[in-house]
Structures are given as C-alpha cells and as structure tokens.
Design a protein with these regions (language model features):
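ATP/NTP-dependent adenylation/nucleotidyl-transfer catalytic domains that generate, transfer
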Residues: 1-153
Length: 153
C-alpha cells in the first residue's frame, strides 16, 4: 500500500510545509532490502521494484485480492482496463500477467511474516494483520492461483 501512503503524504505536503521536505525525502527513496552496498556514486544498487515489478500493479492486485476477494482472472481483467486510464503507466498484458504471477508467489510465500507481525496502524481499508482483517495459514499453497494465472488470455 506504498502508493496509497504516497497520496496521503502529498496531502500533508500541502497542509504542513515543515513536514513536507522530510516526508518527500522518505517517499522518494526507492524501496530496497539494502542487501547490497551503494554503488561508487552512493546510489542504491538494488531496487526491489526492478525485481518484483511495478508497485502500482502490486497495490492494485493486493487491494482487489484482499479487499474484494477477486479471482486472478478478474484481477487481471480489471488491471488491463485500469492501465488504459490516462493517469496510469501503460503496461502490456504480458507484463500484467507476469507481475500477477510474482504477486501471488510472494503473497503466499511471505504469509509466515504476517503471522507474527507487530502491532501497527491501519492505512486505508485493507489490513494484513492476523489479529483483524486477514487470517491465512502460513503453509497455504499458491498452486491453484498460479494455475489460474497461467491460463489467463
């Protein structure tokens, strides 16, 4: 939900100039696991978005999977329509499909982390807290969802 937080921060930029500079610096920093040291120019050498695909797509998939309970087919269909909107980046159908596959693999594969997550705030209408909105076994299999993604046309 990084994209949603960016929109909230943009609102704060307009309302509080003192916070704006600090928040802008934080938001403009690319998400990175920081496993690799910075390059010779001091720039981040490893950017997660380059590996997993667009965060815009991942946020779209997450919202429609968790909040709406949509199937991979419906999410793919809606994503193809949504990216045609003038305010979104253009993504090919193949890019959407590949990113959806990565999303499901990571979503299921990382469930164990959510099962023991610390308390935190809820931003928006979607929460993955195991104490509230989201309950999913850590050993769930992604096979059914990946099969649906593979069959997308």
């Amino acid at each position: 939900l990084r994209c949603l937080v960016q929109y909230y921060a943009d609102f704060v930029f307009k309302e509080n100039e003192k916070l704006a500079e600090t928040l802008k610096d934080i938001i403009d920093t690319p998400v990175s696991p920081e496993l690799l040291p910075p390059d010779k120019d001091g720039k981040i050498a490893q950017k997660t978005e380059n590996t997993v695909g667009s965060y815009i797509l991942h946020d779209f998939f997450l919202y429609n999977c968790v909040r709406n309970g949509f199937s991979p087919e419906k999410i793919y269909f809606l994503a193809k329509i949504a990216v045609k909107q003038k305010n979104l980046e253009p993504f090919s159908d193949e890019t959407i499909k590949n990113t959806l596959k990565i999303f499901y693999k990571r979503f299921f594969g990382q469930q164990f982390k959510r099962s023991c997550m610390p308390d935190g705030v809820k931003v928006g209408t979607v929460s993955l807290s195991p104490r509230g909105d989201w309950r999913m076994p850590s050993d769930s299999s992604v096979a059914l969802w990946l099969k649906q993604v593979e069959n997308l046309k």
